[in-house]
């Protein structure tokens, strides 16, 4: 517990000056994000904070670590099923309540804390698996900017907007998959991620992409495919 917040304080202090690549590498997550051969992992975590109603002495109200400070080259979707957390991406804080989610772009430092019991899920995927760089036009348009490691691409999801709700529904489907199911249904999982990505692009990412408005999409004549 103490070591966790010491790392956070050290990180915040180091953010005052430009962090060297060597220092940032200290926080790189070493856990491989794979389900057999598929570069996707799904995680479910429940953190229980005792209260007086549990028949034990309540812990003093303060922040407890929910997600340790780290970063990874993969993109991540995080969802709170029960409770609430304060989620940090770099130096930016987001309050996630029950039923909320957040998109974490690749290469960004992130962590979370909570004041009470919380149940959350995370889906981590290799962006190069979602859209291959060999498909250069598609990759440059939809994925490459996000891989630059900028916090501005982060976005929270709530039940207040329809496109948010659609993404949350698709994320819940992904969270229902264990390692065996992911390996057996790779195309279905990839397709679900891509549907999420299309909505994310249309409603959020597109506004940050400098050449998105310049692109034109010629119509394909029926029967020409």
Segments predicted by a language model, with ranges:
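A hydrophobic/aromatic-rich effector-binding and dimerization subdomain
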Residues: 20-52, 109-175, 206
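Short histidine-centered beta-strand/loop micro-motifs
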Residues: 58-59, 65-72, 113-115, 133-135, ...
């Amino acid at each position: 517990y103490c070591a966790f917040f010491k790392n956070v304080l050290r990180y915040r202090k180091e953010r005052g000056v430009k962090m060297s690549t060597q220092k940032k590498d200290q926080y790189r997550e070493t856990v491989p994000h794979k389900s057999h051969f598929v570069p996707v992992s799904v995680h479910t975590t429940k953190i229980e904070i005792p209260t007086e109603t549990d028949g034990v002495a309540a812990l003093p109200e303060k922040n407890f670590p929910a997600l340790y400070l780290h970063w990874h080259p993969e993109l991540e979707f995080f969802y709170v099923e029960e409770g609430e957390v304060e989620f940090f991406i770099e130096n930016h804080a987001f309050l996630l309540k029950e039923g909320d989610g957040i998109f974490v772009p690749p290469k960004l430092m992130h962590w979370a804390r909570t004041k009470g019991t919380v149940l959350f899920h995370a889906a981590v995927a290799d962006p190069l698996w979602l859209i291959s760089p060999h498909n250069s036009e598609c990759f440059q348009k939809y994925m490459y900017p996000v891989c630059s490691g900028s916090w501005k691409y982060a976005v929270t999801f709530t039940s207040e907007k329809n496109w948010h709700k659609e993404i949350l529904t698709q994320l819940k489907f992904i969270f229902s998959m264990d390692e065996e199911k992911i390996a057996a249904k790779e195309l279905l999982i990839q397709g679900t991620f891509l549907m999420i990505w299309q909505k994310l692009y249309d409603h959020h990412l597109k506004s940050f992409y400098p050449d998105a408005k310049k692109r034109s999409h010629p119509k394909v004549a029926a029967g020409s495919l």
